Amino acid sequence: MVKEFVQDEEKQRLLLDEHTEKHFTAGEVVRDIIIGVSDGLTVPFALAAGLSGANAPSALVLTAGLAEVAAGAISMGLGGYLAAKSDADHYHRELQREQEEIDTVPDTEAAEIADILSQYGLGPEEYGPVVNSLRSNPKAWLEFMMKFELGLEKPEPRRALMSAGTIALAYVVGGLVPLLPYMFVPTADRAMATSVVVTLAALLFFGYVKGRFTGNRPFISAFQTAVIGALASAAAFGMAKAVQSI
């Protein structure tokens, strides 16, 4: 038997204070980190493997790799900024359009509220007071329509800059991993072998952590991430060897 909800604000507040949500809510930040680190680990790794396949000395591999990391971080960060800015612009355009509809056709918009609530199993006698309450509060009405009709969340004001910085920094951190051996190992062959071991270990670790955060199976995620990185570097190495033999 379902217990009735008691409309006691003080009791509700106590219940909410006692309950700790276990949902992970920093999805956008994690997404940016995943994008930056995954590309940062893979692209410089493939570049270093390709140059090593062409018998380039460690100094050249390191120089080219660092240049790629710098360019990649700027490019990825700019891409993240533009994507977040585009999302914010889209939200504000829809916000303005929805406000105009509330002002010009309020009855139609109220009917849409009723339709949305009816999809959750509420009858007219139940959603009627909710519709009337929202109509008396224009700000809440607009927020309700944006969230439940259009499925749009209000973006954070600094989201674009945060996304750009997070992706760029994550790319640099990931990109330095495959290049570290070339800083300390003088011969290119040994540096490449060390880079392969270090980067594959980093890819496995990153894939495992990514799986834990995203709710996927960690070991499957680790394996998939490592395979993608290995295939990219192997393709670059093989291409360099093929071109060199021509």
From Swiss-Prot:
Tissue specificity remark: Expressed in leaf sheaths and at lower level in leaf blades.
Keyword DNA repair: no
Recorded catalytic activity of this chain's protein: Fe(2+)(in) = Fe(2+)(out)
Single GO molecular function: iron ion transmembrane transporter activity
InterPro entries: Ccc1_fam
Residues that bind Fe cation 1: 98, 101, 109, 112, 149
Induction comment: Induced by treatment with iron in roots and shoots. Down-regulated under iron deficiency in roots and shoots. Down-regulated by treatment with zinc in roots and shoots.
Residues in the Vacuolar compartment per record: 54-58, 186-190, 240-246
Knockout mutant characteristics: No visible phenotype under normal growth conditions, but mutant embryos exhibit higher levels of iron and zinc, and leaf blades of mutant plants show decreased levels of iron and zinc.
GO biological process terms held by the UniProt record: intracellular iron ion homeostasis; intracellular manganese ion homeostasis
Localization, UniProt: Vacuole membrane
Residues reported to bind Fe cation 3: 101, 109, 112
Keyword Transmembrane helix: yes
List of residues binding Fe cation 2: 98, 109, 112, 145
Family: Belongs to the CCC1 family.
Domain comment as written in the entry: The cytoplasmic metal binding domain (MBD) is located between transmembrane 2 (TM2) and transmembrane 3 (TM3).
PANTHER family on file: FE(2+)/MN(2+) TRANSPORTER PCL1
Subunit structure, as described in the record: Homodimer. The dimeric interaction is mediated by both the transmembrane domains (TMDs) and the cytoplasmic metal binding domain (MBD).
Protein's name according to its UniProt entry: Vacuolar iron transporter 2
Naturally occurring in which organism (per UniProt): Oryza sativa subsp. japonica (Rice)
